[in-house]
Amino acid sequence: MRFVDEAVITVEAGDGGNGVASFRREKFVPFGGPDGGDGGRGGSIYIQADDDTSTLVDYRYTRKLRAERGKNGAGANCTGRGGEDVVLKVPVGTTIVDTDSGDIIGDLVEDGQRVMVASGGEGGLGNTHFKSSTNRAPRKCTTGTKGEFREIRLELKVLADVGLLGMPNAGKSTFIRAVSAAKPKVADYPFTTMVPNLGVVDADRHRSFVMADIPGLIEGAAEGAGLGIRFLKHLARTRILLHIIDVQPIDGSDPAHNAKAIMNELAKFSPTLANLPIVLVLNKLDQIAEESREEWCQHILDELQWTGPVFKTSGLLEEGTKEVVYYLMDQIEQQREREVEDPEYAAEVRAFREQLEAETREQTIAAKEAYRAMRKAQRLESMMDDDDDFDDDEDDGDVESIYVRD
């Protein structure tokens, strides 16, 4: 199934049914009085997180969703039937944003979590409500109110504890295959991974975390090179970034230069995201002769001036991967325990997450607008090149036909 992580839809709740003006007519009951029932409430629209849904592709093709209108009231004080609610299922990790105001309506992070995005209209009142001591036969009734109408944007960000970062062909997909049951495509050409992949990593029987593999970045991604930065937003909910470095790139490029390029692109996209804890993994050690591995790895670290945690692995041979898994599991558990035990730290983490969410959303929207503007400019330029007489000059040798009516 095609992976779609963003969609814009319009939702319209059902209108309320109308109240009616009716009078009781029954044998042996003179002056029966009003008995008009109320209209039914219009159906509302809800969005619900669902573990069995993994993409927003359904909402790329069905963009207008409407709930049922409430039924009108009837005599004998019968209230009209309420309109049926509509429940839209989306993947866990979906954020709902009002496109007009930019406000976040809801953030669905748990299976079954539900948010109302459009409220159904209230049913109208029947004439029973308007009887009084001075007006015993009211003919007044009211119509139902309109249902809420909204345009909303659905944004999916995968939920993972660890995010894999690196150049194309750095070995990210091979690494996640080695440490989890995920089976992303692996090949010897760039951009084999086109969509994010999730894998559950088991440190031991009762300890596990989720790892996300996103498509590779290249230098200039912030300006749209390669697959651009559209998938970087999926790292916004991770706790730790695992930077995979190919120590012997197939194109002969410098590993340290590649790593610096990735860090620069990350900082351009979101300085807050770049402040997440980063663990360095020097991968594909099997490509280097054993006697020169240590020297070459130290050269890369010296070039990067790296002082943080670093591991040396071969994802293909599954060498050194267990040590990475145990380290990540310990770090994640420490973070979780501290959030539970220290309310002040938990509040800081929440504020950091909110800032990161807002920053990645703004950058993603800005990048899309810039891409659209670039494509529009390219189309205009192409049109000008194709039209030899675009400037309306009379001296360019074109033939002009003039039709005259006799």
From Swiss-Prot:
<dbReference type="GO" id="GO:0005525">
    <property type="term" value="F:GTP binding"/>
</dbReference>
<comment type="subunit">
    <text>Monomer.</text>
</comment>
<dbReference type="GO" id="GO:0005737">
    <property type="term" value="C:cytoplasm"/>
</dbReference>
<dbReference type="GO" id="GO:0003924">
    <property type="term" value="F:GTPase activity"/>
</dbReference>
<keyword id="KW-0479">Metal-binding</keyword>
<dbReference type="Pfam" id="PF01018">
    <property type="entry name" value="GTP1_OBG"/>
</dbReference>
<dbReference type="Pfam" id="PF01926">
    <property type="entry name" value="MMR_HSR1"/>
</dbReference>
<feature type="binding site">
    <location>
        <begin position="283"/>
        <end position="286"/>
    </location>
    <ligand>
        <name>GTP</name>
    </ligand>
</feature>
<dbReference type="InterPro" id="IPR027417">
    <property type="entry name" value="P-loop_NTPase"/>
</dbReference>
<feature type="binding site">
    <location>
        <position position="193"/>
    </location>
    <ligand>
        <name>Mg(2+)</name>
    </ligand>
</feature>
<keyword id="KW-0460">Magnesium</keyword>
<feature type="domain" description="OBG-type G">
    <location>
        <begin position="160"/>
        <end position="333"/>
    </location>
</feature>
<comment type="function">
    <text>An essential GTPase which binds GTP, GDP and possibly (p)ppGpp with moderate affinity, with high nucleotide exchange rates and a fairly low GTP hydrolysis rate. Plays a role in control of the cell cycle, stress response, ribosome biogenesis and in those bacteria that undergo differentiation, in morphogenesis control.</text>
</comment>
<dbReference type="GO" id="GO:0042254">
    <property type="term" value="P:ribosome biogenesis"/>
</dbReference>
<feature type="binding site">
    <location>
        <begin position="166"/>
        <end position="173"/>
    </location>
    <ligand>
        <name>GTP</name>
    </ligand>
</feature>
<protein>
    <recommendedName>
        <fullName>GTPase Obg</fullName>
        <ecNumber>3.6.5.-</ecNumber>
    </recommendedName>
</protein>
<feature type="binding site">
    <location>
        <position position="173"/>
    </location>
    <ligand>
        <name>Mg(2+)</name>
    </ligand>
</feature>
<dbReference type="InterPro" id="IPR036726">
    <property type="entry name" value="GTP1_OBG_dom_sf"/>
</dbReference>
<feature type="compositionally biased region" description="Acidic residues">
    <location>
        <begin position="383"/>
        <end position="399"/>
    </location>
</feature>
<dbReference type="InterPro" id="IPR006073">
    <property type="entry name" value="GTP-bd"/>
</dbReference>
<feature type="domain" description="Obg">
    <location>
        <begin position="1"/>
        <end position="159"/>
    </location>
</feature>
<feature type="binding site">
    <location>
        <begin position="191"/>
        <end position="195"/>
    </location>
    <ligand>
        <name>GTP</name>
    </ligand>
</feature>
<dbReference type="InterPro" id="IPR006074">
    <property type="entry name" value="GTP1-OBG_CS"/>
</dbReference>
<dbReference type="InterPro" id="IPR045086">
    <property type="entry name" value="OBG_GTPase"/>
</dbReference>
<dbReference type="GO" id="GO:0000287">
    <property type="term" value="F:magnesium ion binding"/>
</dbReference>
<comment type="similarity">
    <text>Belongs to the TRAFAC class OBG-HflX-like GTPase superfamily. OBG GTPase family.</text>
</comment>
<feature type="region of interest" description="Disordered">
    <location>
        <begin position="381"/>
        <end position="406"/>
    </location>
</feature>
<feature type="binding site">
    <location>
        <begin position="314"/>
        <end position="316"/>
    </location>
    <ligand>
        <name>GTP</name>
    </ligand>
</feature>
<dbReference type="InterPro" id="IPR031167">
    <property type="entry name" value="G_OBG"/>
</dbReference>
<dbReference type="InterPro" id="IPR014100">
    <property type="entry name" value="GTP-bd_Obg/CgtA"/>
</dbReference>
<feature type="binding site">
    <location>
        <begin position="213"/>
        <end position="216"/>
    </location>
    <ligand>
        <name>GTP</name>
    </ligand>
</feature>
<dbReference type="InterPro" id="IPR006169">
    <property type="entry name" value="GTP1_OBG_dom"/>
</dbReference>
<keyword id="KW-0963">Cytoplasm</keyword>
<feature type="region of interest" description="Disordered">
    <location>
        <begin position="120"/>
        <end position="143"/>
    </location>
</feature>
<keyword id="KW-0342">GTP-binding</keyword>
<keyword id="KW-0547">Nucleotide-binding</keyword>
<keyword id="KW-0378">Hydrolase</keyword>
